[in-house]
Amino acid sequence: MNWEVVKLRLNMALATLGIVLLGFALALAVADYAFGAQFGVGLMLSILMFIFFLNIIQWLFGPYMINWAYRTVEVTPTDPVYGWLYSTVAEVAKYNGFRDVPKVYIADVPFPNAFAYGSPIAGKRIAFTLPILKLLNRDEIMAVAGHELGHLKHRDVELLMAVGLIPALIYYLGWWIFWGGMFGGGGGNGRGNNGGLLFLIGIAMMAVSFVFQLLVLSINRMREAYADVNSALTVPGGKENLQLALAKLTLSMDPGALEKFKKKSTTNQMASMLFFTNAIEEVPTWNARELVEIWKTTKVPWYAEIFMDHPHPAKRIQLLEKVSKY
């Protein structure tokens, strides 16, 4: 049994459950205080239904919008140029127990990235941008595919969409309380002449929703780490090739990253790297290997990734090292 994986799964489960329970408890208590139990619960349910409906629409039709925004072209097994990419994804899909191969797309955008997406009506999909295909070799592409297919296998989109309802619920509840205070109070224990108090509670709730959004980001970082682990455990050579892929992506976006990490700079937010532009197309493998070795011993302070949706690359490298020991 791989205890690092067990620990990661336990942390994800506890964090997700904690955010949901704490968020609902806070919203229910504040709604009761501001509007009374009956109206407060009704308002909460109405808000939840509203944001749930919007999220469902976005989830169902989002893949089509992504294809349009990223100018994607589907790759078929017989494609004379990129047929190898389809066969690569098919091989990784087999390793991960997929019954059908997800649809494979190439995105015509100027930065290196890969992403998995899909919905019940659009099916499972995985896309690679043209720059990442030039930057990485086939083994590294396989490792990246193992990461992305891990998101599909673990249903990360659906889970994060569900958890993301909590900060939205708290924000819109705060918005209602804010305007209730502006017009003289609600209908619960805080009504009457406490419009000013409700006004402040509304502002506080909207601020608290931002804190919950940071907690959701922490869940996202865990899911990204879990996808890394999936690649390491299901793809032959996945650990080493995913490490090299991450280093090459970092160096392509910031050719000076190696020197920065040599100076032990741990505040550079690399997780946003996948959304930069003007990447270089070739990165020497020995530079990537050197950066991986530096990351293995880099100490990352807790606050370095608080606003990031991906773990710090050094943490990703170190987790992959721990997982591979079992």
UniProtKB/Swiss-Prot annotation:
UniProt keyword terms in alphabetical order: Cell membrane, Hydrolase, Membrane, Metal-binding, Metalloprotease, Protease, Transmembrane, Transmembrane helix, Zinc
Query: Transmembrane ranges?
Result: 10-30, 41-61, 159-179, 197-217
Q: What class of enzyme is it?
A: hydrolase
Instruction: Please give a single GO biological process term from the UniProt record.
Output: proteolysis
Per its UniProt record, what Pfam families does this chain match? Answer: Peptidase_M48
Residues the record marks as active site: 148
Main localisation: membrane
**Membrane topology according to the record:** Multi-pass membrane protein
- State the compartments where it is located: Cell membrane
Has UniProt tagged this entry with the keyword Repeat? no
Q: What NCBIfam families does the entry give?
A: PRK01265.1
HAMAP family from the UniProt entry: Pept_M48_protease_HtpX
Q: What is this protein called?
A: Protease HtpX homolog
Q: What is the lineage of its organism?
A: Archaea, Thermoproteota, Thermoprotei, Sulfolobales, Sulfolobaceae
